[in-house]
From Swiss-Prot:
Membrane topology: Multi-pass membrane protein
Subcellular location field: Cell membrane
Protein name: Olfactory receptor 51B5
UniProt entry keywords in alphabetical sequence: Cell membrane, Disulfide bond, G-protein coupled receptor, Membrane, Olfaction, Receptor, Sensory transduction, Transducer, Transmembrane, Transmembrane helix
S-S bonds: 95-187
Amino acid sequence: MSSSGSSHPFLLTGFPGLEEAHHWISVFFLFMYISILFGNGTLLLLIKEDHNLHEPMYFFLAMLAATDLGLALTTMPTVLGVLWLDHREIGSAACFSQAYFIHSLSFLESGILLAMAYDRFIAICNPLRYTSVLTNTRVVKIGLGVLMRGFVSVVPPIRPLYFFLYCHSHVLSHAFCLHQDVIKLACADTTFNRLYPAVLVVFIFVLDYLIIFISYVLILKTVLSIASREERAKALITCVSHICCVLVFYVTVIGLSLIHRFGKQVPHIVHLIMSYAYFLFPPLMNPITYSVKTKQIQNAILHLFTTHRIGT
């Protein structure tokens, strides 16, 4: 029996074969969800309250934290509903909207990491022009450009989902909706919907990563030319947090993309693990990495707690 995507709900299975353990698995996801909300929420609060953090680098970091919050809020309530409450049905419109926000926020995060690499490149390779290049107006324009690219680029493959017919099954072997999983259920010509995301992965994820890599090659070249050992170390430290975030994000997202596209022989549980690794690890690790590796963030945390302690 076929039905249009706009009228028929989908059924989410969570972890097929592990239904008896769903409640225990949900405890882990709940802990991770709370940690992501707390970490990124705290980071946003610090950047808002501490005027020393009102700089381009931390503006982009605030965008990164907001994106990670958005990704968690988009996926985790559905995951917990499936695993904890056994609420497996999701309306088609909600499913397609979830797929849209998951993929658009992913491309948005890639753009933010690219903008942060540009910030570090200017700060280290051309420090005398930093304030003239990264003016408030230009930083806002970069931020808006990244937002537009992320949210507009995903519209073409998502919009047709509302009009496709879905036959045989409306079951998704997951706890949330991904475009590549939904499209497999459509009984229509989905060539465009399969090719377009692959092109996006190359021209956004891969290209962004290559530009970031090249920028850090140039940064390293500049750092090695600094005579003072102390200044070299100081310059490198300012990049460590960003490099860690870049590695965590691109390893998980490109790994997930490759498995979905070429991993037909890979066990389904591996697909699930890679999906959850992407949705959990970058949002969890980004605030931790910046809190541990960035002196300004550490000072802001101390200032925040000291101020509140004195106030009480």
